[in-house]
């Protein structure tokens, strides 16, 4: 009687690991360019096409297209982050470049949104006061700054897929999987999402097109945060439940219970 043994899987060669690192770095650079364009796109500054510029369709068609574009990003961003999807594509996408591929896919969808976005140039509000305009513009830039700082407080290069590819090339230090709340995370549970909300809503001149973008993005952030927190409770259990009780989700909470995280 003959039995078949499963073929031995060869570990990736150093050349393959270097290729993975190069891929991850290129994905990261593409993400940075996309993020910079997103800032200009939302802020109507420094890029050829913004949220309020360019030719647009009739407003019902423009509204439909814009909502579909945000929905496309929301579906891609959420589905690819699910554990079940990661298990499904793991045989195809090696673990060291899994996160970089996710980041690349998200960047590509954003580029599609920039390209196909339909402006709806009807004013919802326009702040005439210099002081009011300056305050809103400052909040806009503070929002992007908050996002950047928040990424480095956790692990910037791991979040965007570079660290995983680098760790495949060299012995990685043991990962501290304990629950931590560094700096901003002691004030609000999701400072990155808070930053996005600030950046999307703080504008001296709100058009209907910008409002559609801000409103649909806010709905997605609220839904996505709930999904993310479900995963975090599954990972950290009671520690994260206590964190939820003591710290606001997207806005700082005035209430602080004795059992809060250090």
From Swiss-Prot:
It comes from Pseudomonas deceptionensis. The lineage of its organism: Bacteria, Pseudomonadati, Pseudomonadota, Gammaproteobacteria, Pseudomonadales. GO terms for cellular component: membrane. This is Methanethiol S-methyltransferase. Disruption phenotype: Cells lacking this gene are unable to produce dimethylsulphide (DMS). Its EC number is 2.1.1.334. The chain crosses the membrane at residues 22-42, 55-75, 100-120, 134-154, 195-215. The gene is mddA. Keywords: Membrane, Methyltransferase, S-adenosyl-L-methionine, Transferase, Transmembrane, Transmembrane helix. It catalyses: methanethiol + S-adenosyl-L-methionine = dimethyl sulfide + S-adenosyl-L-homocysteine + H(+).
